[in-house]
From Swiss-Prot:
Keywords: Cytoplasm, DNA damage, DNA recombination, DNA repair, DNA-binding, Endonuclease, Hydrolase, Magnesium, Metal-binding, Nuclease. GO terms for cellular component: cytoplasm; Holliday junction resolvase complex. It comes from Ehrlichia chaffeensis (strain ATCC CRL-10679 / Arkansas). The lineage of its organism: Bacteria, Pseudomonadati, Pseudomonadota, Alphaproteobacteria, Rickettsiales. This is Crossover junction endodeoxyribonuclease RuvC. InterPro entries: RNaseH-like_sf (IPR012337), RNaseH_sf (IPR036397), X-over_junc_endoDNase_RuvC (IPR002176). Its cofactor is Mg(2+).
Length: 156
């Protein structure tokens, strides 16, 4: 089974693909980065088309992302909602079910502590999957939510 983990953002969306069978392996990871000088519609189109390309390449069975949270900055929250919405639409066009988990649940499933810092989550991902979490926290957050989904489904 292949799981796509997503960390939505209008500026940068992190993604990862896990293969789950007898064990869990990280197949690929990356980010979709949009140009802040473009209008919102163009940026959402880029997220949509890039994620569609990834879905075509990896043929995932399910996807996971963190539940929405309301930021102190309303503009940031709205941008996050735009990115989440386009991801949900993109996944639904391919009939890929999406599973959502709270931030605290994801952190607890990876580190044992629902209030762990991003550095702790990244460290544990490296230990669990025996990979280097280079790049942004957008990537490690996407891996964490995919791993959380694999654990919650006991798919391996």
């Amino acid at each position: 089974m292949k799981i796509m983990g997503l960390d939505p953002g209008l500026n940068c969306t992190g993604w990862s693909i896990l293969s789950v069978s007898k064990d869990i392996k990280l197949i690929d990871k990356g980010t979709v980065v949009t140009n802040s000088k473009e209008d919102t519609g163009q940026r959402l189109r880029k997220i949509h088309t890039d994620v569609l390309d990834i879905l075509r390449l990896y043929q995932v069975d399910s996807a996971s992302m963190e539940e929405i949270f309301i930021n102190k900055n309303p503009k940031s929250s709205i941008s996050l909602c735009y990115a989440r919405g386009i991801l949900l639409l993109t996944l639904s066009t391919k009939d890929i079910p999406v599973f959502e988990y709270s931030t605290n649940y994801v952190k607890k499933s990876i580190t044992g502590n629902g209030h762990a810092k991003k550095e702790q989550v990244s460290f544990m991902i490296e230990k669990i999957l025996n990979v280097k979490c280079s790049g942004t926290y957008d990537i490690s957050d996407s891996i964490a939510v995919a791993l959380c989904h694999a654990y919650s489904k006991k798919s391996f």
